[in-house]
Curated annotation (Swiss-Prot):
InterPro entries (alphabetical): Epimerase_deHydtase, NAD(P)-bd_dom_sf, NAD(P)_epim/dehydratase
Species this protein is from: Staphylococcus aureus (strain NCTC 8325 / PS 47)
Record field: transmembrane: none
PANTHER family: L-THREONINE 3-DEHYDROGENASE (PTHR42687), L-THREONINE 3-DEHYDROGENASE, MITOCHONDRIAL (PTHR42687:SF1)
Pfam family, one: Epimerase
Domain of life: Bacteria
GO MF annotation: an example: L-threonine 3-dehydrogenase activity
Annotated protein name in UniProt: Uncharacterized epimerase/dehydratase SAOUHSC_00535
């Protein structure tokens, strides 16, 4: 990869992906795009940025041509809970945007990445150590989008030879950008509330285990997969990916190592709880590890320490300004 265009660059993943890619490949070699302008304090501000509605194919093609991109990372999407509230919009944005991005990759011979998700699984999927190849019958519009997206990526690889690469992300946890619209968002919100209020009310019930990953590991995985030897990759629809599996009570106990008085209670959101119940408790990542060397560095304990320290530092800086 030498010239990279990233859609959805102001999202939770996109923001940190832009920063890391600019560190590695050079600021001027990474074009960030999103449907709105970045805020004044956004780290995306320090390099090339263009407005892009991913449902506008002509505009997407124009940006790819003008930037002379050789790689496209398509991150723009509505997340699970938001998509469930707006299923028509979710289909139009998630699928229309992906089709435009894949067509751009086909037309301009781009290396292509787009994320899938554990949301691609459903009630009939094996819940524990979910295999790489298994039943995928999701019960949400977001999940339907992700399964369709996986199949499209596989189709474009087999039919047109497009170098498509993807991973099924678990819940992603980061202190850089507060979340919005995801079922796993509780696992981010809980850290901010622990530092700022000493209490959190979880919309996901105790005993609900979901796969998670610290954002640094997720960004590293994207770059590692994109740089991997093409000949070693046997999966083109989406690699299973995870670093840990936990429920809200386990996060509470990890936080209490640093904030002993932290408390947790529950006000379960039936929509997001229903989504969570349809997802695996844990997934098998052996294909990712074997084919391109996926090796996450962070577990719950080390992630908790970093999250709390980063939020404390962020709030200290904000209060001193």
């Amino acid at each position: 990869m030498k010239k990279i265009m990233i859609t959805g660059a102001l999202g939770q993943i996109g923001t940190e992906l832009v920063v890391k890619c600019r560190e590695i490949y050079g600021t001027d070699n990474v074009l960030a795009t999103d449907i709105r302008e970045p805020e004044a304090d956004s780290p995306v501000q320090n390099g090339p940025f263009e407005i892009l509605d991913v449902t506008d194919r002509d505009r997407m093609f124009e940006l790819v041509r003008d930037f002379e991109a050789d790689s496209l990372m398509h991150m723009a999407a509505l997340l699970s809970a938001t998509a469930e509230k707006n299923p028509i919009l979710a289909w139009d944005l998630n699928m229309g945007g992906l089709m435009n991005a894949l067509e751009a990759a086909r037309t301009y011979n781009l290396h292509f990445f787009t994320p899938s998700s554990i949301g691609a699984f459903g009630d009939s999927t094996p819940k524990v150590n979910t295999p790489q190849v298994t039943i995928q019958q999701p019960t949400t519009m977001y999940g339907v989008n992700k399964v369709a997206g996986e199949l499209l990526c596989q189709y474009y690889f087999k039919r047109f030879g497009v170098d498509t690469r993807s991973v099924r992300f678990p819940g992603l946890i980061s202190h850089v950008k507060e979340p919005g619209g995801g079922t796993t968002d509780y696992a981010v919100e809980i850290y901010f509330k622990a530092v700022r209020e000493g209490h959190y009310t979880s919309f996901i019930d105790k005993g609900t285990y979901m796969d998670m990953m610290y954002m640094d590991d997720a960004i590293e995985a994207i770059i590692k997969l994109m740089e991997a030897d093409d000949a070693k990759l046997e999966t083109r629809n989406g690699y299973n990916l995870s670093a840990m599996s936990f429920d809200p009570e386990m996060v509470k106990e990890a936080i209490q190592e640093y904030y002993p008085n932290f408390t947790l209670d529950y006000d379960v959101d039936p929509i997001r709880q229903g989504i969570a119940n349809s997802w695996p408790d844990s997934i098998d990542t052996s294909c990712s590890r074997g084919e391109w060397g996926f090796d996450p560095k962070y577990d719950l304990a080390s992630m908790t320490k970093l999250m709390l320290e980063a939020i404390e530092q962020k709030d200290t800086v904000k209060n001193n300004n």
